[in-house]
Amino acid sequence: MNRQLFVCNSVYQVLVAMWIKYIYHQREVSDLIISDHMNGAKTLTENIKKTGIFDQVYYVESSAFARHKILFDRKQRIMMSMCPQHVLKNFVKLNAKYTELYMANVDFFSQLLFDALAHQYSRLKLIIFEDGLFTYSRLYEEDYKST
């Protein structure tokens, strides 16, 4: 069974992730990570949990890491490349095995997350989604297929 993990750094990305979930993965289990890259991220996380759209919703403080503000010594860099899942636990403890990872930004945290999940499931699909909501509309899909 497929299980998706969405990573969102903005309110609009959360909206797009909800739309993708609703249109393409309505009957599948999907989880969501909301990062501290935006104001009000904790409140947004709690509100999204209440909707029940996603099975698990995680709040992650990753902005300093994503923006290179955390410096690593040689041992830590080796640990990140050899055991990324161990380093990931400093940010979020994920309890599932994912088949698909959706993200709109590629930064240090996203790379760490992908590496850690790929260690668990070697056929992990990485899907980079864009912020354009219309792209995921059935109307757009029908129009695209007709041309």
Model-derived segments and their meaning:
Residues 5-147:
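Active-site and donor-binding regions of nucleotide-sugar-utilizing enzymes
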